[in-house]
From Swiss-Prot:
Belongs to the transcriptional regulatory Fis family. SUPFAM superfamilies: Homeodomain-like (SSF46689). This is DNA-binding protein Fis. Pfam families: HTH_8. Keywords: Activator, DNA-binding, Transcription, Transcription regulation. Signal peptide: none annotated. It comes from the Bacteria. It comes from Haemophilus influenzae (strain 86-028NP). Homodimer. Residues 75-94 bind DNA. The keyword Phosphoprotein does not apply. PANTHER family: DNA-BINDING PROTEIN FIS. Coiled coil: none annotated.
């Protein structure tokens, strides 16, 4: 499978209000990194064993919700857009009570 070339301008972004009350965009990964930094700081040295699932659920559920809205419930189209097979999509939708 060939990896698609991605234009940095097409990256997922988050709108942020800066100190000068201006709306700017920053990559989603920066927001995820900051959220993880905050979460880990709150742990105060404690270990956690489900961080991967926690983060995945925080991103995966809204992503599935939005893609299903975008495709108007067309699971085949949604699976193609996500780059997964339809069976996998159906399992994920069921996991989040969406299917």
């Amino acid at each position: 499978m060939l990896e698609q070339q991605r234009n940095p301008a097409d990256a997922l972004t988050v709108s942020v209000l800066n100190a000068q009350s201006q709306v700017t965009s920053k990559p989603l990964r920066d927001s995820v990194k900051q959220a993880l930094r905050n979460y880990l700081a709150q742990l105060d040295g404690q270990d956690v064993n489900d961080l991967y699932e926690l983060v995945l659920a925080e991103v995966e559920h809204p992503m599935l919700d939005m893609i299903m809205q975008y495709t108007r419930g067309n699971q085949t189209r949604a699976a193609n857009m996500l780059g997964i097979n339809r069976g996998t999509l159906r399992k994920k939708l069921k996991k989040y009570g969406m299917g």
